[in-house]
A protein has these predicted regions:
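Active-site helix/loop module of the DD-peptidase/beta-lactamase fold
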Residues: 30, 51, 80, 85-89, ...
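Short, conserved catalytic-motif segment at the N-terminal edge
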Residues: 30-86, 122-125, 167-168, 225
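Catalytic-site signature segments of enzymes, centered on catalytic residues
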Residues: 82, 145-232, 240-266
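Short glycine/serine- and small hydrophobic-enriched flexible loop segments
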Residues: 99-103, 190-195, 267-274
Length: 500
């Protein structure tokens, strides 16, 4: 009897292995691992990426999943289970939660935001129409990209606290008028999830998205993620990669600070590509998933996704992480790429090399058949660090010379002349007007306030803020000292009288 049972068990195992073998062989045949390795290594070298994880799905299956490089300064290796901060790839997950609550009848997409967040203060052109939940999802609320970047450095534990400290945010355009990407929208959606569900955002996401999708290495609380192996994020500080751990407000997690592994994100991606279903779990109906991904000609955003006629995607940029998620509209191919670095300055100057790498990895996975016509020469990061450091050093030397000139300037009446006044006027332009204009205009050009620039461009950002401030301080001291010297000399009185 025992022999018969043993034979039955062996036969069952053989049947299962026989069924799995073609799938495994097919998966290996689909993706050329050596080519993927080559592309990843080259990209990590070109874009100074310490660690990276990538997952590829094809026709409802994971066909490639691998980690590369280091997760932190201890040398811990990146694996497919290593969590990374997702940046704005958090937004499709937040949007999924909103769509769940809509399906349950707990909220209506076309209801005004104020119906759920009565504390919200809105100023600006409304055109007689209030922003709705759908406007937040589609990025058509009217809030600006600038304000969305400003809140990333704001202080506050909740969305209400952050909005109170920001003051009454003014709408840039009428709600529903046109697309305008802003992190404000998804911060408020996180607050709506809490209000409607009666649960903290983190608990809701973990219970109703992460658990059903078997996302066991994903976290809606950055502190918990750090305790469970989160890859350390790296930023460039004066040209050197350094581990940076900025404080993160829980209110901003829905817009940009969820954490997940590449393995887990392939589960989420598969659910989005399969009408809201992953294995036996259904987190969303096919109708709601289709609504999230629907493409409208001339409009770049669905409900939580960037959309085109062929591709559905989202990128994410936190201070020290980058992420990309892409899937084909026919449900065939999809990719997840997670990186533990971000250099806003280099991507602003040279182009989004990180996103370029993600495209190339998907193209390599598809053996050059997906969108090669869209790929041009790879983005290359220039060696700008030495020049920036040299420029900042020159400004620092100039500042020191200004201080020396101030201390070692004329102390007697015979040195006081009208020429000194003329020179003072010229220095006013150099030491006051130019630095002041720079401090005011640079945030406008960057599209973010100084406090956000300092978080995303540490080192160089701090130097570009502090040095102009010091020049202005030197100008004030120089003016006070000059006035004092003029007042205490007869020649100075003559000069002052002559200028009247």
């Amino acid at each position: 009897m025992r022999i018969k049972q043993l034979i039955v068990i062996i036969l069952i195992i053989l049947v299962v292995l026989t069924a799995l073998l073609p799938q495994l062989t097919h998966a290996n045949a689909i993706v050329n691992e050596s080519q993927m390795d080559k592309e990843v290594r080259q990209g990590m070298h070109d874009y100074h990426i310490p660690g990276l994880a990538v997952g590829v799905v094809k026709d409802g299956r994971i066909v490639f999943l691998k980690g590369y490089g280091k997760a932190d300064d201890t040398g811990r290796e990146v694996t497919p289970e290593t969590p990374f901060i997702l940046g704005s790839v958090s937004k499709p997950i937040t949007a999924t939660a909103i769509m769940q609550l809509s399906e349950q009848g707990k909220l209506r997409l076309d209801e005004p935001v104020l119906a759920y967040l009565p504390w919200l203060q809105v100023d600006g052109p409304t055109g007689g129409r209030e922003a709705t939940v759908r406007d937040l999802l589609r990025q058509t609320s009217g809030w600006s990209t600038y304000d969305g970047r400003a809140i990333m450095a704001a202080q506050g534990h909740t969305a209400e606290e952050i909005m109170e400290r920001q003051g009454k945010l003014k709408l840039e355009r009428q709600p529903g008028e046109r697309f305008g990407y802003s992190n404000v929208n998804y911060m408020l959606l996180g607050a709506i999830i809490e209000q409607v569900s009666g649960e903290p955002y983190a608990a809701y996401i973990e219970n109703y998205i992460f658990q059903p999708l078997d996302m066991t290495d994903s976290y809606a609380d950055p502190s918990t993620a750090r305790e469970n192996g989160l890859a350390s994020g790296y930023q460039t500080v004066f040209g050197k990669l350094m581990e940076i751990k900025p404080d993160i407000s829980p209110a901003l997690v829905p817009a940009g600070y969820l954490a997940a592994s590449a393995r887990d994100m392939t589960h989420f991606l598969l659910s989005q590509m399969n009408g809201g279903q992953y294995r036996d779990a259904t987190v969303l109906s096919a109708a709601s998933t289709g609504l999230m991904q629907r493409y409208e000609a001339g409009f770049p955003y669905g409900l939580g996704w960037f959309t085109t006629s062929e591709w559905i995607s989202h990128g994410g940029d936190a201070e020290n992480y980058h992420a990309d998620v892409m899937m084909h509209t026919d449900g065939s191919w999809g990719i997840v790429v997670l990186m533990n670095t971000n250099d806003v300055l280099l991507t602003s100057l040279y182009g989004n090399g990180y996103g370029d790498l993600s495209f190339r990895l998907l193209e390599a996975a598809g053996n050059g058949s997906l969108f090669s016509s869209l790929l041009i020469e790879p983005v290359k990061f220039g060696a700008i660090a030495p020049y920036l450091n040299l420029g900042i050093a020159a400004l620092a030397i100039w500042l020191i010379w200004s201080l020396y000139r101030l201390v070692g300037g004329p102390n007697s009446a015979r040195h006081v002349s009208k020429w000194l006044i003329v020179r003072g006027s010229l220095l006013t332009v150099i030491d006051l007007i130019v630095p002041l204009l720079f401090l005011l205009q640079f945030p406008v050009e960057m599209g973010a306030p100084w406090r956000t620039i300092l978080r995303f461009v540490p080192g160089w950002g701090h130097a570009l803020f502090i040095i102009p401030m010091l020049f202005i301080f030197v100008w004030l001291l120089e003016g006070l000292l000059l006035f004092y010297r003029l007042r205490r000399t007869d020649r100075g009185h003559e000069v002052i009288e002559g200028l009247r």
